[in-house]
Amino acid sequence: MPNPTVAIVGLGALGLVTLKNLREEGFDAVGLDRNDYVGGLWHFEEGNKLTVMRSTLSNGSKQRGCFTDFPFPEDSPDFIPAEGIDRYLKDYAKHFGLLEHCRLRTSFHGARYDEKKQQWRLSLSTPDAPEPHFEWFDKVVFAMGADQIPSRPKIEGIEKFKGHVEHSMSFKNPETLAGKRVMVLGFGNTAADMATELAPIADQVYLAHRHGAIIVPRWVKGKPVDHVRTYRKYVILNLMNRYTPGLWEKTMNSVIGKLVHNTFDLKPEWRFDPAPSITNQRPLVNDELIPSLEKGSIISTHGLARVIDENTVETSDGQRYEVDAILFCTGFTVDYSVVGMDADPCRATTTDWQKSRGFTGRPLPRLYQNIFSLDHPETLAFIGHLSFMNPAFFMFDLASMAVAQLWKDPSGFPSKAEMNKQVDDQHAWVIDLAKKGPVTPSIVKASEWMEWVDRVIGSGLPEHLGYTMKGWNFWMRDRKFCNIMMDGLLSPHAYRVFPGKRKAWPGARDAIIAMNADREARFGPMD
């Protein structure tokens, strides 16, 4: 019997790791991408494409931000520039022999499930065959992420504005706005990056935002800010999150709040406070924003309310500003209707989401564990609708391992009623968060999701690093390495150390030891 065929739509970081993990488990998987390269948004390109800017820098360190079985090169800086991540993804594809299974310059137009054939019919085209044609696959993974369609809030009077108006998706060359007065809309990582990129060359940058933000630097006391996580701390925090979520939230907000205020002298007029809770939104990571605000090259304003005339805008507090350009750094949304209305995970989502205070325009799809279609859990998955305080490459490596394992052995799926209940509970939690303010709809309860994925992929970590017979045996047999696993920097490679359902990586042990030795030599012992 031939291996099941799988189409993976998108060959950025999400698609590549999914392709690798599915092929590793014996699936006849291919990746499809309209571009002539792999790497997705990490491959810089001019024009109206969603890509990084040339100056983009990773928000997480190389030690924490890699895939589970493929470290960044040793000579990489601790925070990787966009060009380095693009190269890393291409090296990943070559190392695991993925390129021969990548169909580039292939545009995806839609998919429909055929009940008779029990297969998915995909509509595809290429430059050589521009007319869409059909191809059949047993399973489909959408790995295009949640950032697909630019989101632009309606601004009263915008048609009167005679200056430059652009969404961050297509803005790649800050030099075009040199000497201009620019208003940047938004208060996330993209808005902060755009504003600080423009600050040295623009006449004035206004950063317009409606709410506060948690801002953290990349470096604290000479160490990468994410070099605090150990497995022991992870277990303790997960227990708090599960059994005393209110205390966990209060503790995390307090710890991060102290870090922020010990690092930066935040002025009230910058309006970082009140910041959203860490449960609602991930921190903004930027090293240049505060210095630019201090110098006055960036001025923090209230949110843009309306355009008055060809160059005059008014913010929600009634202040008026003369500007030459407006940049929308207001995020993206996603359209899942490409799988047909019968399978669109957003078609029957709760209307309470759109009514909530924290609704940001993004949909809230009904996906089991934020991955699997409830209509076709054994054949349709979405990689990218997932967010919590963990590095993205690591999270989606785990998520795609879960897809591979559950599609390999579907008996691991709970009943349809149980899957629906999990989604109902997840949505109720997200909507409750949205009562406090803006919330990322892809956010999940970290402790519950990690416990689930540990079990599904068979990582072996809870058994070998817990108070079990396997745990005691591991400690007695390999005490030094056990101690590194428990109290050294928690590495993504830990999830490939022990044998289990997913494939272990023989190099995981050496990689963890080498990484911790290098980290200690350069930064000292773990705090």
UniProtKB/Swiss-Prot annotation:
EC id: 1.-.-.-
Signal peptide boundaries: 1-19
Glycosylation sites recorded in the entry for this protein: N59
Pfam annotation, one family: FMO-like
Domain of life of the source: Eukaryota
Subunit structure: Might be part of an extracellular enzyme complex composed of GIP1, aurF, aurO and aurS.
Name of the protein described by the UniProt record: Monooxygenase aurF
Protein source organism: Gibberella zeae (strain ATCC MYA-4620 / CBS 123657 / FGSC 9075 / NRRL 31084 / PH-1) (Wheat head blight fungus)
